[in-house]
Swiss-Prot record:
It is found in: Cytoplasm; Cytoplasm, Cytosol. It is linked to Defects in Hps3 are the cause of the cocoa (coa) mutant, which is characterized by hypopigmentation and platelet dysfunction. The keyword Magnesium does not apply. This is BLOC-2 complex member HPS3. Residues 218-239 are annotated as: Disordered. Involved in early stages of melanosome biogenesis and maturation. The gene is Hps3. Keywords: Albinism, Cytoplasm. It comes from Mus musculus (Mouse). Found in heart, brain, spleen, liver, lung, kidney and testis. GO terms for cellular component: BLOC-2 complex; cytoplasm; cytosol; early endosome. It comes from the Eukaryota.
Length: 1002
């Protein structure tokens, strides 16, 4: 459906002062207009103070039948006729043509120019002859690269634009015939070419192809590298049979067809590629891929002539996005290939396709009367009929936004859909329109007011018009010459037209119709399209468009906030893109006097709810906070506890909050969540009795569940900083176990991150970044006990071990009483391992003044004994603990043992704490390591006994225990072999007798 509005997209107009009656008109990029009449071409300025003044004029070698300008390369190409022969020529360096007497150089395409003549080309126009084996019918210049594609009866010829470098300061433009595309079963009437995409149009058919290229050193290419299949060739056999019928009063019409992708090969159109470029060509087109085939059938039910149903205005429109996004948060990758759109039209309907990842029909335009020509721009579709100039909106900017921006259609960004109905902004009366072209902010219109033709006698509608009659009538020449004019029409500036569209939408605002939303969406897309290529805008113009863009987002947010439809959620992203604060949005709401009975729509409620969930760093006033509470009390009572927990609502009157909370008992809200919210409000009021009663009304597990439902009751963020609530501060003093369990529940349910929890406890306990409070250590221990899946176990080990070591080395006591003792942790968590008995022998040998030191040491020892710990990774953390202390000695001994460095550990124990050696050996020297009893321990003890000293009696006792163990484990011969040779026989005799009796008993 096409909506019709009466806006003013067209501004002032001027007459272009042409000397001769225009036959062909084309636009010369951003600063020139070309008008051809016979063998003359005039160029007019179209920008600045010299608007519509002639810049230059030059003669062509023949009568111009078609012409086009390429901004890439700055050349004009024309199909000319002379002596009934068709020529193709390109006019280069035309800006140097100052007068009719200026010299002109004529050269052949692809030929190298002698160096002696090169310097003369710098200041004179050149004409490049492009000889063709067949007469050219049409052509198209690539708007991106400047390559030229020429259409003939059965083929398309591609001329690649190149520059012949003469020296460092000078190069001349040239072309190279690089590719021939052979096409059967379709005769091109119009073609369009853009960066490898080829569109071919006949009277009733459109074919869209993509030429795919590879580097020259890639795949080898034959003379005909690809030929598409032609499954309908069998249909050619019947062509001769139908020719007899067609010569009479019968017309054979094929049925309409639309084929996309691989199905296009069913069209019966054969395509072959023939490479004609040089071997050193940088890119060669090796393959062709079919994208779209569309065939139309004439409507013979109305008995109209076939000329009235021909296709026209084929166009491939690239839309470049220069890296500037009006949304300011462009995180999407840029594509080198511009976004491409394909347009073609029948007399009464136009079709616009999007060609990106796939081909998709975007919009269908139904014209109120027969069209003659149309031109597509990034913002509008301009259509001319014999009596009017029509302006339609397009969805190109919407398609680009949805395709390129990964964050589109989320809570961050939104854009009107591509499928939205198009509209006609204006149908401007213009008599005798014949041709139209467009560039920048101008439209060129050619009008010819023909004299009224003598009315002919109408044929009976019952008689089918034959092809013969049609051809005779179409060839009848005009009797009289027509009056003509060439107009330059200025289009209205985007911001001015945007403001008019917004004003227009206000007429629908009160009745809340879809027309208001539709027109505001059109205004938004208009500004978005103008901002697409920001590099072409002046800074002031860009700033004005940006302001209009944000304003349009605000209008769309207002519109969606008043809706109850499924699209009401779009109020959120549009308000975000508008840059409006929550308070500014609330100020735009139309509050009624009877606020208790006011109905609030889903869009507004959705926006406020999501905004309060985010960290807006915005405090609402007492009045606005009360309004928000009232809105949710009326519209979404289940969300009221969450809303009241937002930091943006901190200024709300506590009595007002309690008033609404007490009404939630019958609304299906979680009772524990309501209880916690009431407790937080009571604490804010200073009503401690009410606070305690609320906290006692549920078990601790239910309270933890309530905090999981709404984390902001404990933890809030303000300007990027973690802020504990008053409730969290009170729980730290009164119920630290509940606080730790609640934060652990938040982390387990992904409501808070690891870094945030650490910051929370540090801020809560008033510690700086380097200091670690005991409550945070309690939380880390709880994490280890809970075995959370999202916690890296190794990092948690490092945190705890480093804190235990720091407190032991500095002899620091915890700032609060730990929630769990070492025994509690060992019994509750497998990550805290059982400490070996020999470690207790070490510990009891030292008199620690404070039990807390013992508890920290036991926790550290238990972690080192953990089966989950990689001991080698924690050795650097133990460096602050000296082996001169029992804490250092025991931890280092444990590490050496876990690393199976038993001999080193035995040396250390014999030196520092011999009392623990036998207990250590009994526990650790087993199985494969039992040999160390006589290989390491026995020799060491013997040596120390010989040396004497203060501990000689202790060493002697240890030696006896060692001999007893060895005598039990070895047979007599082995036992004799391990005894020292210089030992006293009387000392070792009892053990030898025991060993021999053991053998006789066995």
């Amino acid at each position: 459906m096409v909506r019709l509005y009466n806006l003013h997209p067209f501004g002032s107009q001027q007459v272009v002062p042409c000397q001769w009656e225009p036959e062909q008109v084309c636009c010369g990029g951003s600063d020139a207009l070309f008008v051809a009449a016979g063998c003359k071409v005039e160029a007019f300025a179209v920008q600045g103070e010299e608007l519509c003044r002639q810049r230059c004029a030059f003669s062509t070698l023949g009568r111009v039948l078609r012409m086009a300008y390429s901004e890439a390369g700055d050349y004009l190409v024309a199909i000319e006729e002379k002596n009934k022969t068709i020529f193709l020529r390109a006019y280069v360096n035309w800006r140097s043509k100052r007068s009719d007497n200026s010299r002109v150089c004529i050269r052949m395409v692809g030929h190298n120019v002698e160096a002696s003549f090169c310097e003369s080309f710098r200041d004179q126009m050149s004409i490049i002859e492009m000889p063709m084996s067949e007469a050219p019918l049409c052509f198209s210049c690539c708007p991106v690269k400047g390559d030229l594609l020429v259409g003939c009866t059965n083929k398309l010829v591609l001329f690649t634009l190149k520059y012949d470098i003469i020296n460092e300061e000078f190069s001349i433009l040239n072309f190279e015939r690089s590719l021939i595309i052979h096409i059967d079963n379709i005769t091109p009437v119009e073609i369009s070419f853009c960066v490898g995409y080829v569109a071919v149009m006949s009277d009733l058919e459109v074919l869209l192809l993509k030429l795919e290229s590879d580097p020259i050193h890639g795949e080898s290419v034959d003379h005909h590298p690809q030929e598409t299949s032609n499954p309908l060739k069998e249909a050619e056999g019947v062509s001769n049979e139908t020719s007899q019928l067609e010569s009479e009063d019968f017309v054979i019409c094929l049925k309409p067809m639309e084929l996309i992708g691989e199905k296009c090969e069913q069209s019966g159109i054969s395509v072959k590629l023939e490479s004609t470029g040089l071997e050193d060509e940088k890119v060669k087109y090796l393959r062709v891929r079919h994208l779209l085939y569309r065939r139309f059938a004439p409507d013979i039910s109305s008995y109209v002539l076939s000329d009235n149903i021909k296709l026209h205005s084929l166009q491939l429109l690239p839309i470049h996005q220069s890296g500037f996004h009006p949304d300011e948060n462009d995180l999407s990758p840029k594509k080198e290939m511009p976004n491409l759109f394909c347009f073609f039209s029948l007399p009464h309907v136009g079709y616009l396709y999007m060609v990106v990842k796939s081909v998709e029909l975007m919009s269908v335009y139904w014209y109120p009367e027969k069209s003659q020509q149309a031109v597509l721009t990034p913002q509008f579709l301009h259509v001319i009929t014999s009596q009017s100039l029509q302006c339609f909106t397009v969805r190109c900017s919407a398609a680009v936004a949805h395709e390129e921006d990964l964050y589109m259609d989320t809570t961050l960004k939104a854009c009107p859909p591509v499928s939205m109905d198009v509209c006609a902004l204006r149908i401007q009366l213009f008599i005798g329109l014949k041709a139209i072209c467009h560039f920048k902010n101008h439209i060129i219109l050619l009008t010819k007011a023909e004299p009224e033709a003598i009315p002919e006698r109408r044929e009976s509608p019952k008689k089918l018009i034959s092809r013969k009659d049609a051809s005779v009538r179409s060839g009848t020449p005009h009797v009289a010459e027509a009056a003509w004019n060439l107009y330059l029409v200025n289009t209205t500036a985007p911001v001015q037209l945007y403001k008019e569209m917004v004003d227009y939408s206000n007429s629908y605002k009160t009745v809340k119709t879809e027309s208001c939303l539709h027109l505001l969406s059109e205004a938004h897309l208009l500004v978005r399209a103008a901002l697409m290529d920001g590099s072409q805008l002046e800074p002031a113009e860009k700033a004005e468009l940006l302001e209009a863009f944000k304003e349009s987002c605000g209008h769309l947010g207002d519109c969606y906030s008043r809706l109850t439809t499924e699209q009401s959620h779009l109020a959120l992203p549009y308000y975000k893109m508008s840059g409006l604060s929550l308070a500014e949005v609330l100020a735009r709401v139309d509050w009624t006097e009877e606020s208790e009975s006011q109905k609030y729509e889903r869009g507004l409620v959705f926006y406020i709810n999501h905004s309060l969930y985010e960290n807006l760093d915005e405090e609402l006033s007492k009045e606005l906070a009360a309004k928000v509470a009232q809105i949710f009390h009326m519209a979404e009572p289940k969300q009221l506890p969450h809303v009241l927990s937002s930091p943006s609502m901190k200024n709300i009157d506590p009595l007002t909050a309690l008033h609404y909370l007490r009404k939630l008992d019958s609304c299906g809200v979680s009772p524990v969540l309501v209880t916690l919210t009431k407790a937080a409000v009571a604490l804010k009021m200073g009503d401690l009795d009410m606070y305690r009663n609320e906290m006692k009304s549920h078990s601790e597990m239910k309270l933890v569940y309530g905090f999981i439902l709404e984390p902001r009751l404990l933890i809030q963020q303000w300007k990027g900083q973690i802020v504990p609530t008053e409730l969290a501060i009170d729980l730290k003093e009164t119920q630290p176990g509940l606080l730790v369990a609640s934060v652990l529940g938040l982390q387990k349910n992904d409501k808070i991150g690891i870094v945030e929890t650490d910051s929370f406890f540090k801020v809560l306990c008033g510690k700086d970044e380097d200091a670690v409070p005991q409550l945070l250590i309690d939380f880390w221990e709880a994490q280890l006990v809970a075995c959370l899946p999202n916690v890296v176990l190794e990092e948690l080990f490092f945190k705890l071990i480093s804190q235990y070591v720091w407190r032991l080395s500095e002899r620091r006591c915890p700032d609060t009483v730990p929630l769990r003792t070492a025994e509690d942790l060992i019994n509750a968590c497998s990550h805290y391992g059982l400490v070996n008995p020999w470690v207790h022998v070490l510990t009891t040998s030292d008199s620690l003044a404070d039990k807390n030191y013992t508890d920290d040491l036991l926790k550290l020892q238990s972690l080192i004994c953990s089966p989950s710990l990689d001991v080698a990774s924690i050795i650097p953390f133990l460096e602050p603990l000296s082996e001169d202390t029992v804490a250092g000695l025991s931890t280092h001994a444990l590490c050496h043992t876990r690393l199976q460095e038993y001999e080193q550990c035995i040396d250390t124990l014999l030196e520092r704490c011999p009392e623990a050696v036998i207990a250590y050996a009994n526990q650790e020297l087993k199985e494969d390591h039992w040999i160390l009893w006589w290989k390491k321990l026995l020799p060491e003890l013997c040596q120390r006994v010989k040396s004497g000293g203060e501990r000689s009696h202790l060493h002697l006792s240890l030696l006896k225990e060692t001999l007893s163990v060895i005598a039990v484990g070895l047979d007599l011969r082995d036992f004799l072999n391990v005894l020292p040779e210089d030992g006293a026989a009387a000392f070792f005799l009892p053990y030898l007798l025991f060993c021999s009796r053991k053998k006789s008993l066995t």
